[in-house]
């Protein structure tokens, strides 16, 4: 009898050991794969590894935060919302949202929608929203609305940017006094030697190609207007987070160039979204691009395809 019990215990122990080994191997495999395929990593502008908690701690002390997104990147859009939630937990009603994706002449529509004067359908039909609004920007707008936060429509109406693209800054002199309310005060400073302006001209086919020298000026009037909108609504003690394409804030140029001309004392923090094949370290050419870099695998899916992609 004792011999039989010993055999049974041995069998049970062997099965338990095998089960434990299988559980360990399974758990290790899950851990290994999850570590091998991160969706993003955070670095400082100098290329040092950072993390989400450090990012939130730093930006919650800033006056103005610029989140430079890639418009078709799902990780950027997800983090925009998550960072907004974390900032709200830290700042409460001292948080303001602002975005390139909404134009200044639509501020009244946002305000009327937030106050429930107009319905969602009316707002969405009139506001000239981006094609990816529903998936990428509506969650931010809804968060602001649901929590009683201000959302600033910061960008110039596209019709005026088109005017500059076609005929230069001089064409804005034809805009009515009512229209000028939606644009940065004229005349607008412009430095053609800024890297962002030179790069814009180069990417568009100039200066040796056929690109119009007015294309960087159209970008500049957007940046100047967004800076003007930020200064119009930000108040001391608040943190304003501005969502824009990374091109508008990379290298602390673009919007920040105009912002610093008006108020150099502002504490600003920039975030840039960058794609790399290997996200374990920041490439040298991306160092200095922003105060924080969100590194995303180049293979990450896109939320939509724009023209030319």
Where are these regions (language model features)?
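Compositional signal for N-terminal targeting/processing segments
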Residues: 33-309
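Sec-dependent N-terminal signal peptides
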Residues: 20-28
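Bacterial N-terminal signal peptides that target proteins for export
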Residues: 11-21
């Amino acid at each position: 009898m004792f011999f039989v019990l010993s055999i049974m215990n041995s069998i049970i122990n062997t099965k338990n050991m095998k089960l434990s080994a299988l559980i360990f191997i399974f758990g290790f495999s899950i851990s290994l794969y999850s570590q091998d395929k991160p969706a993003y990593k955070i670095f400082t502008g100098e290329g040092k590894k950072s993390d989400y908690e450090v990012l939130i701690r730093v930006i919650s002390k800033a006056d103005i935060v610029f989140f430079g997104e890639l418009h078709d990147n799902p990780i950027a859009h997800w983090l925009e919302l998550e960072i907004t939630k974390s900032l709200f937990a830290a700042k409460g009603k001292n948080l303001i949202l602002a975005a390139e994706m909404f134009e200044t002449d639509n501020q009244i529509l946002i305000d009327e929608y937030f106050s429930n004067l107009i319905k969602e359908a009316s707002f969405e039909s009139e506001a000239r929203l981006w094609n990816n609004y529903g998936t990428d920007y509506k969650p931010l707008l809804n968060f602001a609305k649901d929590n009683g936060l201000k959302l600033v429509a910061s960008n110039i109406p596209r019709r005026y940017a088109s005017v500059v693209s076609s005929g230069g800054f001089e064409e804005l002199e034809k805009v009515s006094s009512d229209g000028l309310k939606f644009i940065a005060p004229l005349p607008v400073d412009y430095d053609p030697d800024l890297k962002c302006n030179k790069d814009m001209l180069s990417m568009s086919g100039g200066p040796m190609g056929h690109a119009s020298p007015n294309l960087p000026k159209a970008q500049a009037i957007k940046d100047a207007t967004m800076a003007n909108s930020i200064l119009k609504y930000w108040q001391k003690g608040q943190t304003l987070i501005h969502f824009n394409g990374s091109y508008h804030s990379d290298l602390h140029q673009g919007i920040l160039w105009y912002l610093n001309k008006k108020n150099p004392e502002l504490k600003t923090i920039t975030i840039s979204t960058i794609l790399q094949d290997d996200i374990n370290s920041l490439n040298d050419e991306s160092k200095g691009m922003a105060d924080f870099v969100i590194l995303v695998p180049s293979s990450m899916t896109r939320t939509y395809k724009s023209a030319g992609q």
